[in-house]
Amino acid sequence: MESRIRARCPGPVAFVFSGGSSLGALHAGMLRAVHEAGIEPDFLVGTSAGALNAAFMAKGFTAERVRDLARVWTDLSTQDVFPGLGIWNSLRCAIGTGTLASPSGLKRIIERHLPATHAELSIPTAVIASDLATGSAVAFRDGDLRRHVLASASIPGVFPPVAAEGRTFIDGGVSSHVPLLPARDLGAKTMVVFDTGFP
């Protein structure tokens, strides 16, 4: 069965992860099914929550790593992402930065679970963020992985934009919620799509 599935998946094979905020937890179950089917990625592409999941899985597509990803999501709380959440803190953030929340919690999650650079990944990974000036999708493939994932997950109005590579970026889902075109442009012949169905 596994060999028949692989035969129908000409390479390069891209795993494509959609955004979806907390629904990114669904990717763990999808990954388990794909791993059991014996499909292996040549590279990964992710947007927003999917960028975090793609970068996490890029350390190695193993059953243990899939279980670890599920635990990351199971253990995650609202306070982890939005520390000190409350109307007064939100007002202070809105007055200071024009956004509802500080990115400090999201930064800590990223630093806890992801390596610092793309070069430390075992599987090549493209992180999709949206250029604030042009609205276009940009695929980051090398350099500061943590900053790229932070940019990709910076929901407009919730988190402040992120500066990277001399430009300013917001959530990748604004320009490419399911980053099929970036995956195609990077050479994918087969795409295995992990879509949360949101929005």
Annotate each language-model stretch with its function:
Residues M1-T47, A55-P199:
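Patatin-like phospholipase
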